[in-house]
Swiss-Prot record:
Transmembrane intervals: none
Protein's name according to its UniProt entry: UPF0398 protein SpyM3_1388
Protein family (similarity comment): Belongs to the UPF0398 family.
SUPFAM superfamilies: MCP/YpsA-like
Amino acid sequence: MTAILITGYRSFEIGIFDHKDPRVSIIKQAIRKDLIGYLENGVDWFIFTGNLGFEQWALEVANELKEEYPLQIATIFLFETHGDKWNEKNQEVLSQFRAVDFVKYYFPNYEQPTQFSQYYQFLLEKTEGAYVFYDTENETNLKYFLKKAKDMPYYQLLLLTFDRLNDMSQS
């Protein structure tokens, strides 16, 4: 079994507030290309954390690819309360994250800051690599996860950057 964590920018972090934004289709084209590459190299599990934005779009693509490839999808939420306060539209997205092959809640609820570090360590230990939409020119809290991932021997990272997206949009 080979599992890849998929995570990246939330939609608001890159200024996308509408699913019909033309940038979403370019991002999804890149996702499709990269996920097919993973599948053709033996990956059989895609792991999500349940965030809006990149993960949401990657989940949509992964569900489409299930028609062509034997893949499994899991969502490992940080807390059971993840998304509870989201609006109705976002609750629909949350239900898609819960309608996958495997769902786990790492903690019942928030108690202390160290839970975040423990959660990311768990994700790193349970996956062989990560596909991350992230660019060092636009830093977020993902930088802490990436630092841990880069410190792990044999952990494979594939970054989708703004430069890669620009190249794809021009071709």
